[in-house]
Every structure is written in structure tokens, then in C-alpha cells.
Design a protein with these regions (language model features):
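Conserved active-site alpha-helix within GNAT-family acetyltransferase domains
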Residues: 103, 126-146
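Conserved GNAT acetyl-CoA-binding A-motif
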Residues: 113-125
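Conserved acetyl-CoA binding element of GNAT-fold acetyltransferases
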Residues: 82-94, 146-149
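Conserved N-terminal entry element of GNAT/NAT acetyltransferase domains
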Residues: 1-28, 32, 156-158
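Short beta-strand-to-coil "C-cap" segments at the C-terminal boundary of structured domains/repeats
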Residues: 148-156
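Alpha-helical elements of Rossmann-like donor-binding domains used by nucleotide-donor carbohydrate transfer enzymes
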Residues: 16-20, 37, 104, 108, ...
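Conserved acetyl-CoA-binding loop-helix of GNAT-fold acetyltransferases
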Residues: 92, 98-111, 134, 138
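Acetyl-CoA-dependent GNAT
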Residues: 24-82
């Protein structure tokens, strides 16, 4: 597991926000199942025990006063010509929202991506998740495509 501090700056209240990059190496894995577990595992130093979709997961997280208050967990698809970073999970602690923390977190996330050769960021977002859509748009992401669904009723099969 690679863990590296990547910067710090004040949020809108003046609190110092520290950003850290984490990368799974070899058999290590990253992806929290629950947000509180994610925070506890980092704080307890057990990042190597996380589970994930693949062994290429990475994370950028932010802390205030040594408390994790936000994160982005992401990976890259191996068949992607455009070196897209896919956001798997993102979160800011509800007690720290409305302070510009997601923008700070995303800024350091983009810094890491540029340094590692990524050229694009993508995220699946439900059309019903207005807060997530707004946070994506606040950092310059745009709606790109539509997912089509049809829910099948049991009698549709007969």
C-alpha cells in the first residue's frame, strides 16, 4: 500500500484540510463497504484489509484535525484508451458539508490524476441523486450520456 500526503489548504472556515493519496499495490485492495468503516480503517491503519472490485483501486482522502472528512475512491479500466479514472465512491462527512471540501478534495484528486497520466474522469450518478449531480457539476463535470432501463414485471416473462 502506498500512502502519500499531497497537500493542504484552508477550507471556507479557515480549518486546515490535508489531502492524502493511497494506492493498492500487489494483493492490497481498497474499497470501503461502509463510509464509517472506511474512515475507521484508515484511522486505525488497516487500509490493507479493505476489499475492492480490483487490485488497481486508489483513493484520495482529506482530513481536518486528523479526522477523515472526505474521500474519493477510484480505479482505471484496463481496456480504456483514454486513461479514464472512474470514481467508485465519493463522500464528505455530513458535519463538514457546505464548506467547499468537495472542491478541495476534487482538486487534489485531479492533481494526482494529471501526475499519473489520466486524461478523463467519469462517474455513474443516478438521475435522482440531485446532491451528487450538483457536486459533480461544481467541479466542472458535465452530463455525458444517458442510461436506459426497463424494469420487468414477472408476467412479462410469460
Amino acid at each position: 500500500m502506498v500512502v502519500k500526503k499531497i497537500g493542504s489548504e484552508p477550507d471556507s472556515t479557515g480549518a486546515i484540510v490535508t489531502a492524502t493519496y493511497m494506492e493498492a499495490i500487489g494483493g492490497s485492495r481498497i474499497v470501503p463497504v461502509l463510509m464509517k468503516n472506511f474512515v475507521k480503517l484508515i484511522e486505525d491503519g488497516h487500509a490493507g484489509k479493505w476489499v475492492t472490485f480490483n487490485n488497481k483501486s486508489k483513493a484520495v482522502y482529506i482530513e481536518i484535525d486528523n479526522k477523515i472528512v472526505g474521500h474519493i475512491v477510484y480505479d482505471h479500466r484496463s481496456d480504456d484508451l483514454f486513461k479514464t479514472a472512474w470514481i467508485i465512491l465519493s463522500w464528505v462527512d455530513e458535519n463538514y458539508r457546505r464548506r467547499g471540501l468537495y472542491k478541495i478534495l476534487h482538486k487534489y484528486f485531479e492533481k494526482v490524476l494529471k501526475e499519473t497520466g489520466s486524461t478523463k474522469i467519469a462517474s455513474y450518478v443516478s438521475v435522482n441523486n440531485a446532491a451528487r449531480l450538483a457536486s459533480c457539476e461544481s467541479v466542472g463535470m458535465i452530463k455525458h450520456c444517458y442510461r436506459m432501463e426497463k424494469h420487468l414485471e414477472q408476467n412479462d416473462w410469460q
